[in-house]
């Protein structure tokens, strides 16, 4: 009786082990496909974030923009830069943050324009 019980337990563990291994392989494959789907633009954006020291979300919050439109970014940048002018009682630190945020958003718009141009060229031909 104990022998049969031990065999059942061992078989059950083997089944669970195989199922776990299969699920793990599927998860790795899905992760790889998702990473490839994000493409190079996500990698470039992450690299720019690490170089500039400011994330895209933080830059958008600083300049109070939700969409990356050059006009809105420039308008908010000029306003915040003038308001934080040290000569007018503003903060040089905040002014620096505003400049870094604008630089980061400009870099992101450049990356987006690079990734959208090849797609547009292929649709035109």
Swiss-Prot record:
Compartments where located: Mitochondrion inner membrane
Membrane topology listed for this record: Peripheral membrane protein
Alphabetical keyword list: Membrane, Mitochondrion, Mitochondrion inner membrane, Protein transport, Translocation, Transport
Keyword presence, Metal-binding: no
GO BP, one annotated term: protein import into mitochondrial matrix
Protein task: Regulates ATP-dependent protein translocation into the mitochondrial matrix.
InterPro entries per record: J_dom_sf, Tim16
Main location: mitochondrion
Organism: Xenopus laevis
Key word Zinc present: no
GO cellular-component term (any): TIM23 mitochondrial import inner membrane translocase complex
Gene3D superfamilies reported in the protein's UniProt record: DnaJ domain
Domain comment, as recorded: The J-like region, although related to the J domain does not have co-chaperone activity.
Complex and partners: Probable component of the PAM complex at least composed of 1 mitochondrial HSP70 protein, 1 GRPE, 1 TIMM44, 1 TIMM16/PAM16 and 1 TIMM14. Associates with the TIM23 complex.
Family, similarity comment: Belongs to the TIM16/PAM16 family.
Renumbered residue ranges of the record's region J-like: 58-110
Protein name per its UniProtKB record: Mitochondrial import inner membrane translocase subunit tim16-A
């Amino acid at each position: 009786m104990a022998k049969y019980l031990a065999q059942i337990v061992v078989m059950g563990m083997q089944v669970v082990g195989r199922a776990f291994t299969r699920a793990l392989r599927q998860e790795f494959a899905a992760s790889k496909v998702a990473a490839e789907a994000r493409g190079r633009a996500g990698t470039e954006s992450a690299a720019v974030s690490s170089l500039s020291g400011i994330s895209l979300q933080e830059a958008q919050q600083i300049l109070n923009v939700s969409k990356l439109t050059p006009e809105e970014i420039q308008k908010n940048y000029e306003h915040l830069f003038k308001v934080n002018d040290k000569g007018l009682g503003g903060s040089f630190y905040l002014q620096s943050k505003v400049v870094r945020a604008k630089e980061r958003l400009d870099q992101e718009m450049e990356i987006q324009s690079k990734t959208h141009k090849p797609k547009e060229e292929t649709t035109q031909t």
